[in-house]
A protein has these predicted regions:
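Active-site metal-binding loops of divalent metal-dependent hydrolases
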Residues: 68
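N-terminal glycine-rich FAD/FM-binding segment characteristic of electron-transfer flavoproteins
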Residues: 65
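Signature for the C-terminal beta-barrel architecture of outer-membrane proteins
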Residues: 1-4, 12-46, 51-61, 90-206
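Surface-exposed extracellular loop regions of Gram-negative outer-membrane beta-barrel proteins
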Residues: 71-89
């Protein structure tokens, strides 16, 4: 097997369209997701983004189809990532942002895939998202209910050696997550907001 692989492609079309693709695998994972004939198609993340859409009195900063990341309340209320990151209050790249963005990062267990948007004007801003994606989880042997979500590295059902695990953990759970946030802006730099999200699963959690 080759070592860790991570490939990214980002393309823009005019002022509005942006296409993002990424393929990532850890050491020990299979290279491809499925085959078309003899062609191996790798597991990939993708997003198609339309930017700067003006509709009525709203400016839609981003409308995203595919994989996206979402952050609400500096990550205190909601943030999807496989990696711990402390709250930051720095400038430029070190500042945690608010909203939804195309996602071609290495995050896979908590990756979101679906539809998301972010819009606003001088008085308020709003964001919303809907995601449906598979999750890795530890299942109870007795009834196949979910004991816990798990971040697998590498993501495989194989145990030590060539034997498979007693219960599969890779993509054993389907999750639907939806949510959003609206923030009023009475003064520049001052926000009064309401945020909510909900996650639903196709297996009981015990």
């Amino acid at each position: 097997h080759p070592g860790d692989l991570h490939h990214k492609i980002v393309a823009t079309f005019g002022k509005h369209w942006k296409l993002s693709l990424a393929s990532h695998r850890q050491l020990g994972e299979k290279v491809y997701d499925f085959k078309i004939g003899d062609f191996e198609v790798p597991t990939a993340k993708y997003s198609l983004t339309y930017r700067d859409l003006k509709l009525g009195g709203l400016k839609f900063d981003r409308v995203i189809l595919g994989n996206f990341s979402a952050t609400i309340g500096q990550g205190v209320i909601f943030e999807n990532t496989d990696f711990f990151s402390p709250r930051r209050s720095g400038y430029s790249w070190s500042r945690r942002v608010h909203g939804v963005f195309p996602d071609i990062s290495r995050t896979r267990e908590y990756a979101l895939k679906g539809l998301a948007f972010q819009a606003g004007n001088k008085l308020f801003d709003v964001m919303g998202f809907l995601s449906k994606n598979k999750r890795d989880a530890i299942l109870n042997i007795s009834d196949s209910s979910v004991a816990s979500l798990i971040t697998l590295y590498p993501r495989t059902n194989n145990g030590f050696g060539v034997e498979s695990l007693l219960m599969p953990m890779l993509e054993t759970l389907e999750e639907v997550t939806y949510g959003g946030s609206i923030r009023l802006i009475p003064l520049y730099g001052t926000f009064i907001g309401f945020s909510a999200y909900e996650s639903l699963y196709d297996k009981p959690l015990r």
